[in-house]
Amino acid sequence: MSEAKTLLVGGLWKNNSALVQLLGLCPLLAVTSTATNALGLGLATTLVLTCTNSAISLSRRWVPAEIRIPIYVMIIAAVVSCVQMLINAYAYGLYQSLGIFIPLIVTNCIVVGRAEAVASKSSVPLSALDGMAIGLGATSVMVVLGSIREIIGNGTIFNGADQLLGPWAKAMHIQVVHFDSPMLLAMLPPGAFIGLGMLLAAKYLIDNKMKQRATLKAESQAQGLPEGKTGAL
């Protein structure tokens, strides 16, 4: 498997920052009350990761090892400030919804961790790819969790998408279920923890199933039997 493919698979699934490393849980749990908020913060985080990884990789030869972390944080803070101004200018409703969690991307362990683990040691293309993969992996978890909570809590999905993507995105708003009494627990912090726990359990089950299939396939190939069968009687 090529290095680029390894980074993609790792960021999106095997080393997913939200479901495997459990990093950045504060914004993940707080902002995912709706799919729109989750998508907005996820895209902002992905943009920050891609830009900061590229900038840090580009300047890694001129950064003294003794002060690299403060310099990384300054680069991250500069990129986050630009992203914050862009959201404020073009998606003000989303900017108000996300609030303090946009500038808090600066302190997100995911961003600093990838800067130290990958960007400071890899080429610019690989660093940018890693940032994009990690960001999209986190975004996918945010959107799935936000969608689950929004459907259970309000019966809708992508309500207010026009605040993020423009007037055309009003068509993305879908009334999935009509509730006489919405389940507010899903929109509150306990609902976020329960939803995340369900996603963690689902990933664990899928990974176990994939390992079992891989083991069975390897045993079948070793014994010269058709795939899915073993020599056991």
From Swiss-Prot:
<dbReference type="InterPro" id="IPR003667">
    <property type="entry name" value="NqrDE/RnfAE"/>
</dbReference>
<keyword id="KW-1133">Transmembrane helix</keyword>
<feature type="transmembrane region" description="Helical">
    <location>
        <begin position="69"/>
        <end position="89"/>
    </location>
</feature>
<comment type="similarity">
    <text>Belongs to the NqrDE/RnfAE family.</text>
</comment>
<keyword id="KW-0812">Transmembrane</keyword>
<keyword id="KW-0813">Transport</keyword>
<keyword id="KW-1003">Cell membrane</keyword>
<feature type="transmembrane region" description="Helical">
    <location>
        <begin position="22"/>
        <end position="42"/>
    </location>
</feature>
<comment type="subunit">
    <text>The complex is composed of six subunits: RnfA, RnfB, RnfC, RnfD, RnfE and RnfG.</text>
</comment>
<keyword id="KW-0472">Membrane</keyword>
<protein>
    <recommendedName>
        <fullName>Ion-translocating oxidoreductase complex subunit E</fullName>
        <ecNumber>7.-.-.-</ecNumber>
    </recommendedName>
</protein>
<keyword id="KW-0249">Electron transport</keyword>
<keyword id="KW-0997">Cell inner membrane</keyword>
<comment type="function">
    <text>Part of a membrane-bound complex that couples electron transfer with translocation of ions across the membrane.</text>
</comment>
<dbReference type="GO" id="GO:0022900">
    <property type="term" value="P:electron transport chain"/>
</dbReference>
<feature type="transmembrane region" description="Helical">
    <location>
        <begin position="93"/>
        <end position="113"/>
    </location>
</feature>
<dbReference type="GO" id="GO:0005886">
    <property type="term" value="C:plasma membrane"/>
</dbReference>
<dbReference type="Pfam" id="PF02508">
    <property type="entry name" value="Rnf-Nqr"/>
</dbReference>
<feature type="transmembrane region" description="Helical">
    <location>
        <begin position="182"/>
        <end position="202"/>
    </location>
</feature>
<keyword id="KW-1278">Translocase</keyword>
<feature type="transmembrane region" description="Helical">
    <location>
        <begin position="128"/>
        <end position="148"/>
    </location>
</feature>
<dbReference type="InterPro" id="IPR010968">
    <property type="entry name" value="RnfE"/>
</dbReference>
